[in-house]
Amino acid sequence: MRKGVHPKNNLVVFKDGSNGAMFLTRSTLNSKETIKYIDGKEYPLITVEITSKSHPFYTGQQKFVDAAGRIDKFNKRYKKS
C-alpha cells in the first residue's frame, strides 16, 4: 500500500443509543469520547441511533402491512363495469 493514501483504521466501539448494546469493530471513524470496553482497554466511542440489536427487522418485532387487503379494496373501488 502507498503511504498517506489510505485512511487510518482502528478499533472503535459502536454503542446503540436505544438499548446500550456495544460492538467492537474496525472503522475509519474516530471520536474524542472514549469508553472502557469489557476487555479492559479504552477505545473511541461512536454512539448510533439503531443497530441490529434494536432494529425491528432483526429483533423479530416488525409488523407487516396487509397489502393484499389494500389491493383488493382498490380493485373493488375502481373496477370497470
Swiss-Prot record:
One of its GO terms (molecular function) is structural constituent of ribosome. It comes from the Bacteria. Keywords: Ribonucleoprotein, Ribosomal protein. This is Large ribosomal subunit protein bL31B. One of its GO terms (cellular component) is ribosome. Pfam families: Ribosomal_L31 (PF01197). PROSITE patterns: RIBOSOMAL_L31 (PS01143). PANTHER family: 50S RIBOSOMAL PROTEIN L31, CHLOROPLASTIC, LARGE RIBOSOMAL SUBUNIT PROTEIN BL31C.
